């Protein structure tokens, strides 16, 4: 079997940076399979996207874009004739340099929010508000927490692309993002995207390391966002929910129809619910968003123990 091929696209420790490149079967001497595949690294130019580094991965059936400048988020994708993602007013991807996370009372995160899958965290992941932490002198101090934390607005310091030939050749993209400050928590997020040639699936593996010398708080939320063709009036969330609880009084208004999505409404105020999902003995579980007719659906799988 042909040995795995690898390319380092970014390595700040060794001053390595590749602005653009394209990898195809022909360029690396591999046979074309599954309709052909490609991986392209580029840097966007113009508007709020200026300077954003992206990697476009096409496995011959599924294609998706990973944002190296935005916490290794998954921006958008296409599978067959289905688009994957949503149409955000932010119209990104937005370079974090244009995002002030503390503006509008900590809601600045929304200015760059338009990924299909974006990570929230790592020190905090929820709504903006005040928190009490130890300062550099060991005294309790009040600080402002912004919406959904910092990790989605931090660039990868190390990025590596791997092609693993085999019966089902794999494309693997690894990125390392650090959220760290002196006298503050220090996190290292290592993200790995893996997809096989010709498949309709991408696996995402995240490892978070505390590289400080003392324990720290840790939170992470996967903010997953889908529009048409999966989301339409009457679309349903299909999930093994043992218990569903409204997040607030607004969510409680429609708790009886928590799994059914309405048509777009001007001025709609979001409704969010908490779920306790049934899982297999090993902790694995899943959920699916399907359109009203049941002809299109997207499934997410994860492990409750992780």
What is each stretch, according to the model?
Residues 1-197, 201-203, 226-234, 239-263, ...:
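Surface-exposed acidic/polar loop and edge beta-strand patches at domain peripheries
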Residues 66, 207-212:
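Asparagine-centered strand-capping/turn motif at beta-strand->loop junctions
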Residues 77-78, 214-221:
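Short, hydrophobic/aromatic beta-strand segments
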Residues 187, 222, 273-275:
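Aromatic side chains
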Residues 206-207, 224:
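Generic detector of well-ordered alpha-helical packing
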Residues 210-213, 227-229:
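Short coil/turn motifs at secondary-structure junctions
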Residues 271-276, 281:
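Surface beta-strand/loop "capping" patches
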């Amino acid at each position: 079997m042909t040995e795995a091929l690898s390319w380092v696209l970014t390595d700040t420790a060794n001053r390595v940076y590749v602005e653009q490149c394209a990898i195809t079967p022909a360029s690396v001497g591999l046979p074309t399979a599954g309709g052909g595949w490609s991986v392209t690294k580029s840097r966007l130019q113009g508007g709020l996207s200026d300077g954003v580094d992206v990697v476009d991965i096409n496995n011959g059936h599924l294609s998706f874009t990973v944002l190296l400048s935005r916490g290794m988020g998954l921006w958008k994708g296409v599978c067959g004739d289905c688009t994957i993602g949503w149409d955000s007013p932010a119209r990104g991807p937005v370079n974090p340099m244009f995002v002030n996370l503390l503006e509008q009372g900590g809601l600045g995160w929304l200015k760059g929010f338009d990924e299909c899958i974006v990570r929230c965290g790592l020190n905090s992941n929820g709504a903006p508000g005040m928190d009490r932490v130890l300062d550099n002198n060991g005294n309790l101090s009040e600080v402002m927490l912004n919406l959904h934390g910092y990790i989605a607005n931090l660039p990868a310091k190390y990025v590596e692309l791997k092609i693993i030939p085999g019966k089902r050749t794999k494309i693997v993209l690894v990125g390392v993002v650090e959220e760290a400050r002196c006298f503050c928590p220090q996190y290292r997020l290592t993200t790995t995207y893996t997809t096989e040639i010709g498949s309709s699936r991408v696996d995402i593996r995240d490892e978070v390391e505390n590289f400080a010398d003392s324990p720290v708080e840790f939170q992470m939320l996967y903010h997953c966002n889908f529009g048409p063709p999966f989301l339409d009036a009457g679309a349903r969330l299909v999930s093994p929910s043992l218990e569903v609880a409204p997040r607030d009084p607004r969510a409680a208004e429609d708790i009886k129809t928590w799994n059914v999505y309405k048509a777009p409404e001007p001025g709609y105020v979001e409704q969010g619910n908490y779920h306790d999902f049934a899982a297999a003995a090993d902790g694995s579980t899943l959920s699916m968003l399907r359109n009203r007719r049941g002809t299109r659906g997207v499934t997410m799988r994860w492990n409750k123990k992780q």
